[in-house]
Amino acid sequence: MKDNQPILEVDRIIHEPARLLIVTILYTAEKADFLFLLNETGLTRGNLSTHLTKLEAAGYVNIEKSFRGKIPQTLCSLTSSGQEAFEKYRKQINQFLKRT
């Protein structure tokens, strides 16, 4: 390893622990509503919303808002870019762990 080089260059959007948890859930579940993510992550509504917004801005998450009767529903899923980014992240982490 050269001086001044980071040990591991990974996608910082995904690497943040709360977003990593969200992306992992969406990768395995394909789609999840906001309340499911809220319960599974243990985040507050505001934190979950903020992290989903960052993932959406990066093009990793698709957020669909609709109504079921009069009840609002927010459905989240990974985009193909999000799936690819998560798979790349996993590969990088696995390769790094094999080196240590």
For each predicted feature, which ranges?
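N-terminal helix-turn-helix DNA-binding core of bacterial DNA-binding proteins
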Residues: P6-N47, S66-S77
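Glycine-centered, phosphate/nucleic-acid-interacting loop/turn motifs that mediate DNA/RNA or nucleotide
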Residues: G59
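Amphipathic alpha-helical dimerization/coiled-coil segments
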Residues: K2-I7, T24-I25, Q83-T100
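Short beta-strand "wing" residues that participate in macromolecule-binding interfaces
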Residues: I63
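Residues within the DNA-recognition helix of helix-turn-helix
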Residues: H51
